[in-house]
UniProtKB/Swiss-Prot annotation:
Record flagged with keyword Chloroplast: no
Organism whose genome encodes this protein: Rattus norvegicus
Lineage: Eukaryota, Metazoa, Chordata, Craniata, Vertebrata
All copies of domain VWFA, residue ranges: 313-495
Residues making up the signal peptide according to the UniProt record: 1-27
Cellular component GO terms, alphabetical: extracellular region
Listed PANTHER family: NG37, VON WILLEBRAND FACTOR A DOMAIN-CONTAINING PROTEIN 7
Ranges where the record places region Disordered: 231-272
Encoding gene, per UniProt annotation: Vwa7
Name of the featured protein: von Willebrand factor A domain-containing protein 7
UniProt keyword terms in alphabetical order: Glycoprotein, Secreted, Signal
Amino acid sequence: MLPVEVPLSQLGPPVLLLQLLLPPTSAFFPNIWSLLAAPGSITHQDLTEEAALNVTLELFLEQPPPGRPHLHLEDYRGRTLLADDIFAAYFGSGFSSRRFRAALGEVSRANAAQDFLPASKSNPDLHFDAERLVQGRTRLEGALRETLVAARALEYTLARQRLGAALHALQDFYSHSNWVELGERQPHPHLLWPRRELWSLAQVGDPTCSDCEGLSCPGNMMNLTMLTSGYFGTNPPKPPGKCSHGGRFDQSSSQPPRGGINKDSTSPSFSPHHRLHLQAAEVALLASIEALSLLRSRLGTRGFSRLLDITPASSLSFVLDTTGSMGEEINAAKIQARRIVEQRQGSPMEPVSYILVPFHDPGFGPVFTTSDPDSFWQKLTEIHALGGGDEPEMCLSALELALLHTPPLSDIFVFTDASPKDAFLTNRVESLTRERRCRVTFLVTEDPSRAQGRGRREALSPSRFEPYEAIALASGGEVIFTKDQHIRDVAAVVGESMAGLVTLPLEPPIFTPGEPCVFAVDSLLSKVTVRMHGDISGFWIKSPAGLSQGPEEGIGPLGHTRRFGQFWTVTMTDPPQTGSWEIQVAAEGTPRVRVQAQTSLDFLFHFGISAEDGPHPGLYPLTQPVAGLQTQLLVEVTGLVSRQKLGDGQPQFSHAVLRRVSEGTHLGRVSLEPVGPPERGLLAASLPPTLLSVSVPFSLELVGQDVGGQCLRRSAPQPCSVAPVLLELSGPPDFLTPGSKAPLSLRVASFSGPQDVDLRSSVNPSFSLTSNLSRARLGLNESAWGCLWLEVPDSAAPDTVVTVTVTVTAVGQGASQVPPTHAFLQLLVLAQSSKDQLEDPTHSAAPVLPPTTPALLPSTLVTRGRAGRGTTGKTWWGTVGGVLFLLGCTSW
């Protein structure tokens, strides 16, 4: 552990935990994947996660769990904090830290992205570079204010993005300035107080550094008592006598005075003041804890817990058709919602938030979001079936609205008896479900093969529900067809799906009537349930011991069978026998079979590409791989045993299996290599080039063994897809204001061959949005750039979240086989003067989060040039930036 040089008696309660943290081999490079370049360094990701764990443990210590033993600080002294450990101690062993770790991943990736995004990586204000310390503090306070406003509006994805940006700037202050060189070992007492001066800032004519010829520059600073920071690159140019940032990526470090002062890593090749790296990291960690504690004081414990998803529970999100024929369905939704509220209120599984979006042709919405179950119930009771009833309805528009306001890793339930009128949104909604990692289940009280139905103007096609099928497949959900008399019973899947279940992979993955399918049950699974629906005439389930159970309702030798029309569930008796189970179904057509279970062992994942040409080396996160671009699969296993039990062994995943979704054919098997300490559960693998050569959806399954040697299999809830092009969308570093005009930068690049593409953009709400790039012809490894201008009307309401969507569609021969690519960007509208501004520190105990003035980016012309070095030799870097599917916001 790193020593703390400040007496513990001088620190506040959050800082008392510091001795427990910061493993010496874990800030300053972007993420842990940077450590290949500088082993032993502490990264932005480390600092962010450790600070969040500190504040979370403090929260757990102050808020004892109802009906459970209190946590004691002494139990964690001398140990590295692990999310799985403290969650198990607080909530119990059956509750997963997966959502919390996913939220931390969102913040950490948003933090790291500041070093990669075109709009932020070279902006000195966002990194406290070039002696722009006052401007840097203004941007820092603005990002914290955005975090606060977005969290209060229940827009947690946006709040985590802005929190990551704020923490990056805060941590950079201690690595890029000379605060540590001045002998300071505590955070700057005025940095989060905007009405207090930073004091003793070096002026334009003050020399700050002397020349340093070598890589390591321990004595290159002048005898200063003034605060300064280094210049990076050529914008702005370094004045005579000033310090450089330093390191191999800094062009200014070769100009006198040579060298630099950054403490980003332990490597002199990157950090001339590498010897002060650990000291800078200690202070940056203290400052990060201080900032998170500030947010907790402003949001309250409940609001802060939702910001970081310090809960095993998910959100409850309904999309309701309110046309005249939907009376039974609406009542079923109300019954399930009431049951969930009553059963879970006050428990760890109480929903984090409640979302409701009605639709009724020709309209949809508005969206209703709340964290108060009573308010949600009141709103739900006001929903009634209205007049009308013509097929089809604006279902996908309502679903898109729900996706934009539902937290990641949530289930969304759509109740309807109509096909979609807005089927043209199918691809965009599919992409949004993957980006938000939300699972969509459609409960449809309409037989797709039935020609009759509710009122309609023309004959209905049996394929009219295919958009629902496509979205359910892309999101990992399902479409359940039922009838009015069964909807209340079938709707019980709402409560069951919200229990944090995992879906077990079937072998073969594509079900064939009359042929058995196999699924593996390991020792970490409980409450195994088989769900089947379709035109089923019979089924048989066989255990590893050879016991069988058929379609007879009631309790059988293996579990409890229930039937509601053509919807069947079989809940296995706990504990289920470990080993290989078989299912065989007799049905007309293709039955739908899903096996789910409860477990604490699961995984999160995202993709990444190596970044070598930015300010720092690292692995840049993507939500999906890009065709032709060398990509890493990055896995984070959740629910591993604590360090105290490692001697007894732990489950291990050895490889990942990739399959084509439509046919289930084998696409490849890749070995998973551990990264860092085993208790962190981090794994990585290189995706095979054959997978990245075409844009096809594929499933991801991890395979390994549990502690007893039984086969261990976990599958990603959603299929993955390979994007045909890399699409970047990035905005200004600040918030929007009413009456402003903000430029957004756009880039599209191809790595799989020449492509002609069309680009379309839209914005919600309907503000004015113009673009100077509507079509591009791309060669191999070429990019096209453009600019969008977003005009915010004077009448725009403060605290409004604006979502910009860009869609790239291939044109020309074979274009119909190439799926569209979408990018989503969320921005926040704030008033210049806000109610969130607090009083001066002399009248308040908390730091102030004041308004800031956004600085607009210069106009970007449409140009074309080389995207990078290609996909062979050195790993490509050059066009990645901005937002790819709301880039790096979530991990499943």
